[in-house]
């Protein structure tokens, strides 16, 4: 047997076929085991960008199941806390880490170079801790008081959060030459943003009705304003700021989708 035959036999089998980018998005954005994918390559993750909202839908579906189970056992407040914890665990806290690093840097009021250095530091400062407390507390509070709207909110918010990442990657320049943003932009293909946006628009309408479309519009507005601020402040966006965009977008989505009477009427 030749060495080429041996290598061929040992090569992992790609079960996903043309849907491999969806698997790559899940592998990158969650802790879910994703068997049957080839070894991760530099271009694999950027080429999965148009499927980030689909990965968000998977996250939302899992959270819906967790929330249903928690609701059977406990009251709405406990269910909300369980959901927020499960949310962080399911995504390995990746976006939360970016949130804390971003606010430690941009709220330090130092030079651009010093802010980027602070964001590289793995230690959490006061501003990062405050940002984490605010985001986690708001998520739990919105879900605890959502009534029946919690289900729509928890399914759709991760979709809108991942779309915010796609918008940030496509719309704003990377702050570092060798950073994650540069890697993403190097492999962007025509139609990536359009594909992600069409999927997000459809999911927002199907899951949330008119309320979902309003949530998407508000997420876009906040994401754009934050992207402009951080681009002016840092010279572009980084992997940390993408995480922050996702977390803040999720809070905006939850705030909109859990408005008591108006959003429930619009969703019907």
Swiss-Prot record:
Pathway: Cofactor biosynthesis; adenosylcobalamin biosynthesis; adenosylcobalamin from cob(II)yrinate a,c-diamide: step 7/7. One of its GO terms (molecular function) is cobalamin 5'-phosphate synthase activity. The chain crosses the membrane at residues 54-74, 80-100, 124-144, 150-170, 202-222, 243-263. GO terms for cellular component: plasma membrane. It is an enzyme of class 2 (transferase). Pfam families: CobS. Joins adenosylcobinamide-GDP and alpha-ribazole to generate adenosylcobalamin (Ado-cobalamin). Also synthesizes adenosylcobalamin 5'-phosphate from adenosylcobinamide-GDP and alpha-ribazole 5'-phosphate. This is Adenosylcobinamide-GDP ribazoletransferase. The gene is cobS.
């Amino acid at each position: 047997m030749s060495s080429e035959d041996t290598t061929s036999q040992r090569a992992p089998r790609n079960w996903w076929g043309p849907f491999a980018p969806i698997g790559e998005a899940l592998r990158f954005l969650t802790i879910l085991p994703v068997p049957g994918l080839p070894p991760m390559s530099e271009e694999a993750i950027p080429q999965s960008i148009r499927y980030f909202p689909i990965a968000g839908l998977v996250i939302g579906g899992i959270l819906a199941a967790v929330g249903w189970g928690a609701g059977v056992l406990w009251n709405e407040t406990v269910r909300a806390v369980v959901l927020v914890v499960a949310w962080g665990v399911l995504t390995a806290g990746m976006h939360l880490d970016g949130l804390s690093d971003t606010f430690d840097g941009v709220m330090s009021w130092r030079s651009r170079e010093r802010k980027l250095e602070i964001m590289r530091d793995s230690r959490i400062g006061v501003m990062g801790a405050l940002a984490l407390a605010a985001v986690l507390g708001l998520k739990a509070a919105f879900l605890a008081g959502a009534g029946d709207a919690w289900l729509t909110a928890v399914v759709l918010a991760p979709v809108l959060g991942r779309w915010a990442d796609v918008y940030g990657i496509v719309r704003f320049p990377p702050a570092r030459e060798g950073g994650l943003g540069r890697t993403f932009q190097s492999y962007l293909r025509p139609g990536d943003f359009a594909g992600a946006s069409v999927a997000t628009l459809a999911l927002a309408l199907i899951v949330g009705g008119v309320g979902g479309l309003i949530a998407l519009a508000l997420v876009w507005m906040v994401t754009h304003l934050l992207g402009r601020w951080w681009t002016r402040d840092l010279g572009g966006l980084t992997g940390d700021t993408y995480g922050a965009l996702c977390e803040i977008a999720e809070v905006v989505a939850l705030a909109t989708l859990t408005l008591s009477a108006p959003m429930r009427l619009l969703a019907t």
